[in-house]
Amino acid sequence: MRRLIAILLTFAFAAAACGSDTTDPGASGTTSLPDKNSIPTTTTSGPATTTTLPGTSTVGPTTTLPGTSTVGPTTTLPGTSTVGPTTTLPIVELGDLMFVSALVPFTACDDLLTYLWTEASARVGPYGLEGAGWYGGGGILRSGVMRMEVDDVVAMAMPDSVPMGGGAEDPTVAQASVGEADGGSSNLEAGVDFSGTNVQELGIDEPDLIKTDGNRVLIVEDQWLHHVDVSGGTAVLTDSIELTGHWGSEMLLDGDRLLVLAQTEGWVGEDGSVGSENAAVSRLVAPGHYKSLTTLVEVDLSDPADLQIDNTLTVEGRYVSARVVNGAARVVLTSGPEQLPFVYPQNSAGEERATEFNRQIIAESVVADWLPSYVHEAADGTFTDGLLVDCDRVSHPTEFAGFSTLSVVTVDLSAPMVAPDTTSVLADGETIYAGGGHLYVATTSYVDPVDDESSWEEMDRNYATSIHQFRVSDPTATVYVGSGSVPGHVLNQFSMSEHAGYLRVATTLGGPWGFREESESVVTVLAADTGEDLVQVGQVGEMGKGERIYAVRFVGDVGYVVTFRQTDPFYTIDLSDPANPVVRGELKITGYSGYLHPIDGDLVLGIGQEATETGRTMGTKVTLFDVSDLDNPTALDTWAPGGGGSSSAEWDHRAFLWWAPLDLAVLPFQDWNSGEAAAVALRIADGTITEVGRVDHLPASDEEEPLVEPPCPTIDPGELGLDEIQVGLELDRAVYMLCDEDTRPEMKGFWCQTLEQEAFFDIAEGLGVSPVVLQTITELVPEGQQLTTCLPEDYEYNWTPPIQRTLVIGEDLWSYSYGRLQANALDGLDRTDVVNL
C-alpha cells in the first residue's frame, strides 16, 4: 500500500504541474508546447474591424500586401468570431490566371509555382488542402496558420516575378562503418580492433546514438553530447556539452568532426519569445506559431576536453534519416507548407465562399510558402539564411505525389559545414535505403481522400508505395533521377536492396493496418540504372497468404522473407534472373523473426519471438537458419529463454552486434515478468547457438552512486514537516528544492516536478498533513519561487534502464544504457569499467 501511495503521489504531483495554467510560466515553472495542430490566437488591435462571412471564422494576424490598402470600417456578422488584425487584398479576376503544363525538373521558380498553383487549385476546398495527400503524406499540417479576411477576396493574377531560392555492389553485412574508422590517435581497423554501427550495406554508414573509432566513444543523450576516452587503461569522461534547444537522436562521425542530427524546439510565443536559446528559431517561425524543425549540429572533437560547436544548420521539416555515401552525409528531410492562411467554415453554409477564398490564397502564394527555409549559424556567430533549395533543383514525379517537399541535404564531412547543397522532390518520404551508388526514399503513394467505406476498401486493394531514386556518386551533390511504384507497403529499409543494376523491393499487398485473408507478399524487381523512372522488370508473389512481412534480407542474388500471422514461413527467393524471380524454398516454424542477419553464405540468424501454434507470442527467440540449399532451408538451432522477454534488435538493427572474430552475437534483452534488463551474448558455432553469458547494469555493491548537483538550493524536508511522510512512503532519496518560478529544473537520473501549491495542499491534506504544517510550507516558500521535488527514476522499483547498444573495443564488450557506459571483458564477461554520464 505504501508503494501504491508513493506512485499515486508522484503522478499526482505530475498531474498538478501539468494541469496548472501554463500560459504564465511563473505559474508552474514549466513551459508546455502546444499541440502542433492547435491554432494560437491573438487579441484584436488597431482601429480597423473585420468582415467575416456567416459560418466562417478568422483567427490570427495577417500581412498587408504591397500596393494594397484597407478603406473604411468593416463589420463582424452575427454568429462569427474575429481575432487579430486583417488584410484587404487587391481584386483580380480568376480568368486572368493562365496555367501551363508542368515541367520535370523545374527550370525556374515561375515553372515551379505554376505547377503548384495548378495542382493546388484543383484540390483546394473549404478546409484548405487538408486531406490533399494526407494518405500519402502530402497534406498540409495546419499549425497556427494565419487567417485573412474573406469578403473582399477573389483571385489574383500571376506575379511578373517569383522570389528565387537562396540555398546554396554486393549487399554485405558490416559491423563497421566508413565514418567511424578514422580519427583516433592510432589507426585502428573497424571489424578487427573495434566494432562500429551495424549497417545494412558495407561502406555505407548509418547514424546512431553512439559512435566509436576505437579510441573514444561518443554518446548523444537527450540534450547532451558525451565524449569518453577509452584509449587508456581506464575510461574517462573528458567532456559533455549541452545541445541547447535541441534533442539529439543520432549522429555521424568522421575523424575529428561529428554531425549531430537533432530535433529542435520550434515554438515562438505570441510575444515573440522563443522556447529555446536557438537564435535560428525566431528567424524561421512567426510569433504564435509552431514548426517542425531539424538541426544539423557540427561538433569539433579535436580537443577531447573542450568540445566545440562549430556550425549549425536549422531547417524547416522533419528528419527522416541519413546515410554516408562517398564521404558525404545525405540527410533526408520532409516538409509541408504549414502556414498558408486558409479559412475554415464553421458550417456547410460557408463552404462555397471559403472554397473561393482558399483558391485565392493559392493564387497569391509565392515559392517561399511552399519550399522549406534554412538558417546557417557559423562558429563566429554570423548567420546565413534563405530557401533550402533553389527552384531549378526541385523536381516532381510524373505522377502527382502531394504538396510535401522531400529534400536531400548533402554535407561534406571532411570540411566545415556551410550553406546547404540540396535537391528536392515534391513528394513525401518515410523510409530510406542506400546502395549501389543510389539513395532511395520510399513513401505511401499519393491518393486523393476518400469518404465512404467502399472507397476505403478500394484504396486498401490499390495501396502502393512510391520510391524516389537519387544519384549519390558525386560527393558534393545529390541528384534526383526518377521515381517508380510497387504494389503494397514496405516494412522498413531492409525491404529494399540494389544489386547489379536492379532494385528489389519486398512488400505486403494492401495497407499496413492489419491482416487481410486475401493479402500476400511479393518481391518486385525494378531496373535501377536507366537514368529515368524506375520500371518493373520482374515480380514473384504468393508468399504468406493472409499474413504480412515481418522481416526481409537480400544478400546478392538471394532474398529471404519472413511472413507471420500464426506460424513463420521463412522463404528463400532466387533473384539471379531479375526478369523471372522464383520462390525456391519455404520453412514453416512457430513464431517469427523480426530481424535477419547473414552470418556467412550459408547461415542466417533470425531475432524475433517464439509463439504458440495459434500465433500468441511467448518471448524472445533466436533461430539459426541453414540456407545452403535454397530449395530446402532448415532451422539448425534456436535459443528461447522463455519468460515473455523481448529484444529491441527485433525492430532496430543497430541494437544487434555481430563480432565475427569470436562468432559472437550480442543483443539487448528485457524480461518484463522478472524485470531483467541485460545484454545476452550468444556463441554461433558448429550449427548451434550457445548462451555465453549476460551483462547487466545493476550497480555493484561497492559501486558509489554518481553525484548529481541539484540545480536549485535544496531544502530539508524536515523543515517542511514532510520528514515522517517521506520516510513512510520510502521517499528517502527524494530531493526538495526552492527554484525560481521561471526555471525548469532537471536532474540527471531524477524525475523533477514543480508542486503547484493548491494541488499540493489537496494531496497533502488527503495524506493527513495538518493545516499547521501546510501553513509552515507556505511561509517557507518565498514569493517568486516554487517548491520542486525530484524523485530518483529507479525509486521503488530497483529498476535499471535497458541496455540499448553494445560495442567491442579491444578485449572488452562495452554496453550503453541511459546515463551509463560499461565495459565487460570479452573473456568471461567480468565487469571491468563503468562511466556514469
What are these regions (language model features)?
Residues 777-782:
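Short acidic beta-strand-loop surface patches of small beta-rich interaction domains
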